[in-house]
Amino acid sequence: MHTPTRQDDLTTWLHYLGNIHVSAIDMGLERVLPVFRALALAKPAFVFTVAGTNGKGSTTATIASICQQAGYKVALYQSPHLISFNERIKIDGIEVDDHTLIEAFWQVEQIRQACGVSLSFFEFMTLAAFYCFAQQHCAVWVLEIGLGGRLDVVNIIDPDVAVITNVAIDHTDWLGATREQIAKEKAGIIRGDIPVIYGEFDMPISISQQLQSLQAKYYCYCLLYTSDAADERSSV
């Protein structure tokens, strides 16, 4: 397949990226690691990584907005998009333009070919997003996990805060058939000695065990609000 150039448009690049790997989903970090390392991207000052069955999009958007209002230059990575691919990659709330994306795609593709590895569409897109964020010197990165957590390409970067919104039965072909199995995959974003936030009260045992084994700095439950918020809220 012909490799697009910097002069090709975004549609051409997206078609190419959708056809260079044998499967749309291919869990694991082994193929991605050499490309990521060769990119040699500077680590941002602060990284939020958000996993969970539901609510990842609204959670990442809220975190990004708060950080931006606080005066930081904020990178936001989400998926999937609704209308335009560019929605997935934002800096200070503004979608990255086609030219910036194409340059990122071209840079990642040169390194991918040099490393001799194949990347899925999501893996390639994620590395391109990281390249955009690093080139724009974003201080805070807010990253949404695509699928699961432990083996998701987003998890290649160590977070400073890990957020798991909730855990429900979903994507059982990839994450496991039970809530505990799925939770164990999502718990893969947890690192030792960082804040971990879990967004529902019935925490799966596998997440609790991961917190204990890694001695995560602390964790808390999010506040729950109903129509009777004043009576229903529960503190950390």
Language-model features, listed with the residues they occupy:
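ATP-dependent carboxylate-amine ligase catalytic core
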Residues: 25, 29, 33-43, 69-157, ...
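Conserved catalytic-core segment of NTP-binding enzymes
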Residues: 149-151, 158-210, 214
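Conserved small/polar residues in nucleotide/adenosyl-binding loops
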Residues: 225-232
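Short glycine/serine/threonine-rich phosphate/pyrophosphate-binding segments
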Residues: 58-62, 149-151
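Conserved adenylation A10 loop of the ANL superfamily
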Residues: 50-57, 165, 226
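Aromatic/hydrophobic pocket-lining residues that form π-stacking "cages" and hydrophobic walls in ligand
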Residues: 63, 129, 207, 211, ...
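Short functional linear segments
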Residues: 1-52, 59, 65-70, 77, ...
